[in-house]
Amino acid sequence: MYTSCAASHGYVTSNGFSIPDDSQYNPSAKRSLVSVHMYSPYDFAMNPDMSKVNFNDAYRNELDQSFRVLHDKFVSQGIYVIVGEMGCINKNNLDQRINWAKYFVEQGRKQGCGSIVWDNGNWDNTKSAEETFGLYHRSQGTWEPDDLVNAYISASKASLG
């Protein structure tokens, strides 16, 4: 598995990032995997600015482009891509986060990229929404919000037809 500095999806798609040729070890199968972190689009997913709460068409287009580039550079060449960290912070916009989660996971799957949700256990957005990626209450063994977690799961199973 290969990743770039800070696992930036932008850098792995640049000309400065390359993957070693692993064909000498097994000429019939590529075994390389690229891992990226994708909190995209930044203004919606990670920027704590509470005015950027709606998952709109411009943000959808940005995600489409990011996944398309990952597909074209890696997946189309037989190199797997896993988004090893993804999520969007809590700006009291659960319905929009659900829309984002479904779209992110489904678009990633359409382009051949798997996704792993980031949960840092931080829930408190009363002072700032910064880094509020909490989903699982470790001390209680419960998920919150259930609707968001279910959106991730449903999107990972949905038919892509």
Question: Where would I find each of the regions flagged by the language model?
Answer:
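Aromatic-rich peripheral "rim/lid" segments of glycoside hydrolase catalytic domains that contact
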Residues: 93-161
